[in-house]
UniProtKB/Swiss-Prot annotation:
Encoding gene per record: ybeY
Keyword rRNA processing: yes
Protein name: Endoribonuclease YbeY
Record has Zinc as a keyword: yes
Cofactor needs: Zn(2+)
Length: 158
């Protein structure tokens, strides 16, 4: 996968960036995404993610991850359904905005390592970019076990 990492905080250690890239690459393989699939991860402060949450979700609080999936339907644009394949264009699945501050707070609250929480945050957002959700029970029973399987197989067990 082609993962663009943007660190607006300017303080994310290289080891954490590597963990993010590795866990997302692993998750992409589990979902059998094309190797040229694109996405971005932007690290922001609690204040910035609170602003994004307020602007796009009308919720005035910081959160760990906000996902913006690109849900393009080529057929709606008058293009063939396999447009990306026909023209060898990588599929961009979207963008994640992540607060490491919030992830650290949650790791402490839940009593597990920061690395586990960071992996959880990444996989959770990644699954949202790929159409998974947990609002309704019938969706949750698909997303949550898959999320746990990816984390466990990657080595980030509870």
């Amino acid at each position: 996968m082609d993962i663009q990492i943007i660190d607006e905080t300017k303080i994310v250690p290289e080891a954490q960036i590597k963990l993010v890239e590795d866990v997302l690459e692993f998750a992409g393989q589990k979902l059998e995404l094309a190797e040229d699939t694109e996405m971005s991860v932007t690290f922001v402060t609690n204040e910035r993610i609170r602003q994004i949450n307020q602007e796009y979700r009308n919720t005035d609080r910081a959160t760990d991850v906000i996902s913006f999936a690109i849900e393009e339907d080529p057929e709606e644009e008058g293009l063939p359904a396999n447009f990306e394949e026909l023209f060898d264009i990588p599929k961009n699945i979207g963008d994640l905005f992540v607060s490491l501050e919030k992830a650290a707070e949650q790791a402490e609250t839940y009593g597990h390592s920061f690395e586990r929480e960071l992996g959880y945050t990444m996989v959770h957002g990644f699954l949202h970019l790929n159409g998974y959700d947990h609002i309704h029970t019938e969706d949750e029973v698909k997303m949550i076990p898959l999320q746990e399987t990816i984390l466990d197989e990657f080595g980030l067990k509870r």
